[in-house]
């Protein structure tokens, strides 16, 4: 299983956004990360428990705390969709 790190794509497995893909933007502590859907799906930028995420093998090259526009550009450059 891939590690949770900055730029890693993941699927939300718990809560009302279960099944949605997100991008990890920042690591807050050992239990929480900051994720975003980058305006490409209904997941807004928010803190999320690592236990509620299933990491995917895909990873994009972004800086820590990147804004949604930078994340969207990196996803388009890599040819990855969050749909």
From Swiss-Prot:
GO terms for cellular component: cytosolic large ribosomal subunit. GO terms for biological process: ribosomal large subunit biogenesis; translation. GO terms for molecular function: RNA binding; structural constituent of ribosome. Pfam families: KOW. It comes from the Archaea. Keywords: Ribonucleoprotein, Ribosomal protein. HAMAP family: Ribosomal_eL14. Belongs to the eukaryotic ribosomal protein eL14 family. PANTHER family: 60S RIBOSOMAL PROTEIN L14 (PTHR11127), LARGE RIBOSOMAL SUBUNIT PROTEIN EL14 (PTHR11127:SF2). This is Large ribosomal subunit protein eL14. The lineage of its organism: Archaea, Methanobacteriati, Methanobacteriota, Thermococci, Thermococcales. The gene is rpl14e.
């Amino acid at each position: 299983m891939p590690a949770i790190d900055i730029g890693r794509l993941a699927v939300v497995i718990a809560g009302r956004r279960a099944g949605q893909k997100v991008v990890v933007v920042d690591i807050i502590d050992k239990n929480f990360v900051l994720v975003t859907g980058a305006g490409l799906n209904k997941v807004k930028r928010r803190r999320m428990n690592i236990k509620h995420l299933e990491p995917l093998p895909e990873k994009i090259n972004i800086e820590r705390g990147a804004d949604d526009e930078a994340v969207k550009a990196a996803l388009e450059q890599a040819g990855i969709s969050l749909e």
